[in-house]
C-alpha cells in the first residue's frame, strides 16, 4: 500500500459487453497522471473521452497479456496521448515501449503500480497491484481462472502463479479480473481462496491440472484476428500509415489551390486549437468524433487529415480505415 493519502487516487472500472472485458482507468487527482489497463479497440472513443474529460495525462497503456478474444487499443492510445504501451517482459509483442519484469513499478503521480509475473494462462501474463487492489487479467477470475490450452499456457504455472503470488496478498485485497460474464465486478482474495471451485486454498496441483486439461472449451471466436493484431500492440500494420512527408507552407498552399469540391482537409484537433488557427476551409472533426461524421466523410472523394504533430491524424486514419474508408 502506498503511504500517500489515498484520497487523490481515482479509479474507474469500464466494461465492454460484447467481449465481457474489463478496462481499468486510474489516476492521481493531484497531478492528473494516470494509466489504463486492458483497453479495448472498439471502446477507444469512450476511453479517450474519459481521459480528455477528466484531464488525465495518460502515462501508460497496459496490457496484461496478448489477448485472444479482443483487440487492444494500447497503440491507438499511445498515438493519441503519448502514453507508453506496456507489456510483460516475456511477451513477443512488436513495438511495445516498456516490457515489465516481475516486481517492476510504474509511477503515476503519488502512486505506484507493481507488476507481478503470473504466467499460466499465457506465458507472458502479468498482474498488477496498487492501493489494495489486484488487477489479475485472465489469470485469476471471479470463481474461476483463465484457460491454459493455447499461447503456451501451462496449468502448473498458473497454479503456482495464483497460489504462490496472488494468494500471498492479504485476504482483504480486492480482485479485479480481466473478464466476467455473469455481471460480477470484483472479488477479494479470501473469497477466491474459499469459494473458487478450480483453485480454492485446499486445491491440489494434481486436481487442478486434471480440471484444466479437461475443460474442452471452444476456441475464442476472434482468436485468429486478435492474436496477430495484439502482437503488434493492436495496430494492424496492413492498414498502412498516413503520409509522413513534411509539408512546407508552399506545399500546403499548392494543395489547397488544387482541392476540388469533392476533396476536403479535416482538422482532427480540439475546437480550441482549431479556433487559434487552422487551414482555410478545413472541417473540424476532433479525434474521437469521426464516427459521428462517417457518412459526411464518405461523401468526399478524398480527405486530408491534419493535426499538430501527425499523431492524432494517424489515429483517426486507423479508425477510418477500420470503418472501410479508402479515400
Features from the language model and the residues they span:
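Divalent metal-coordination and catalytic microenvironments
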Residues: 26, 38, 65, 77, ...
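Core dinuclear metal-dependent hydrolase active-site scaffold
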Residues: 25, 105-130, 168, 246
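Short hydrophobic beta-strand that contains or immediately precedes a catalytic carboxylate
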Residues: 36-37, 264-269, 285
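Conserved beta-strand hairpin/beta-sheet module of binuclear metal-dependent hydrolase folds
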Residues: 3-57, 127-136, 143, 270
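Catalytic cysteine-centered active loop of the rhodanese-like fold, especially the PTP/DSP P-loop
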Residues: 116, 285-327
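Active-site neighborhood of phospho(di)ester-bond hydrolases with catalytic His/Asp-centered motifs
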Residues: 36-39, 58-67, 85-90, 118-120, ...
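Accessory terminal helices/loops
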Residues: 1-4, 160-174, 178-264
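Active-site HxH/HxHxD metal-binding segment of metal-dependent hydrolases
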Residues: 19-20, 41-117, 318
Amino acid at each position: 500500500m502506498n503511504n500517500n493519502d489515498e484520497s487523490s487516487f481515482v479509479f474507474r472500472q469500464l466494461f465492454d459487453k460484447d467481449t465481457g472485458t474489463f478496462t481499468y482507468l486510474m489516476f492521481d487527482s493531484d497531478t492528473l497522471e494516470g494509466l489504463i489497463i486492458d483497453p479495448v479497440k472498439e471502446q477507444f472513443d469512450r476511453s479517450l473521452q474519459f481521459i480528455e474529460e477528466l484531464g488525465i495525462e495518460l502515462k501508460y497503456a497496459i496490457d496484461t497479456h496478448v489477448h485472444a478474444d479482443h483487440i487492444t487499443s494500447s497503440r491507438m492510445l499511445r498515438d493519441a496521448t503519448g502514453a507508453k504501451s506496456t507489456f510483460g517482459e516475456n511477451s513477443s509483442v512488436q513495438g511495445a515501449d516498456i516490457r515489465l519484469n516481475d516486481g517492476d513499478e510504474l509511477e503515476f503521480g503519488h502512486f505506484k503500480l507493481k507488476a507481478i509475473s503470473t504466467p499460466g494462462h499465457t506465458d507472458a501474463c502479468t498482474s498488477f497491484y496498487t492501493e489494495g487492489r489486484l488487477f489479475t487479467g485472465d489469470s485469476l477470475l471471479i470463481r474461476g481462472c483463465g484457460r491454459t490450452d493455447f499461447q503456451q499456457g501451462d496449468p502448473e504455472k498458473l497454479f503456482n502463479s495464483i497460489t504462490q503470488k496472488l494468494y500471498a496478498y492479504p485476504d482483504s485485497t480486492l480482485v479485479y479480473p480481466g473478464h466476467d460474464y455473469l455481471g460480477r465486478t470484483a472479488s477479494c482474495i479470501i473469497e477466491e481462496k474459499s469459494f473458487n471451485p478450480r483453485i480454492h486454498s485446499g486445491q491440489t496441483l494434481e486436481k487442478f491440472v486434471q480440471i484444466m486439461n479437461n475443460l474442452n472449451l471452444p476456441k475464442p471466436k476472434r482468436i485468429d484476428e486478435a492474436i496477430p493484431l495484439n502482437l503488434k500492440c493492436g495496430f494492424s500494420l496492413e492498414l498502412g500509415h498516413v503520409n509522413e512527408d513534411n509539408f512546407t507552407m508552399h506545399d500546403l498552399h499548392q494543395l489547397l489551390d488544387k482541392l476540388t469540391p469533392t476533396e476536403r482537409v479535416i482538422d482532427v484537433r480540439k475546437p480550441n486549437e482549431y479556433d487559434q488557427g487552422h487551414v482555410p476551409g478545413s472541417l473540424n472533426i476532433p479525434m474521437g468524433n469521426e464516427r459521428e461524421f462517417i457518412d459526411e466523410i464518405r461523401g468526399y472523394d478524398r480527405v486530408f487529415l491534419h493535426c499538430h504533430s501527425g499523431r492524432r491524424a494517424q489515429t483517426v486514419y486507423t479508425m477510418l480505415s477500420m470503418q472501410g474508408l479508402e479515400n
